[in-house]
Amino acid sequence: VKVYVGGRSLAGAQVTVDGRPLDPRYDLKRLSPAGFEWTYEGNGPAQLALALLADHLGDDARALALYERFMREVVADLDNSWELNAAEIDAAIRKIGG
């Protein structure tokens, strides 16, 4: 089961999946020049939502269709330090109608 972890350090916002840096997936859509963010709605949180969904779902088209709702419902409400597992992401996707 994949585990996604986000936190802040002097180097900025860092997000990992199973201990490895999460790919921002700029190849799908470049929403944020500054990388990932969370705790609010905006470009950085949208990039994180897209990256989380693309990695979790393995379906780029579905990730592109869902990332804005996922950003508003999940990413904007994350704490400064957070952890999400696959079951939590699946539950959030069901909640937003994905």
Where are the predicted features?
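Long, low-hydrophobicity ectodomains and other hydrophilic envelope-associated domains
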Residues: 1-2
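Short, compact, well-ordered microdomains
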Residues: 58-96
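Amphipathic alpha-helical packing elements
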Residues: 6, 11-66
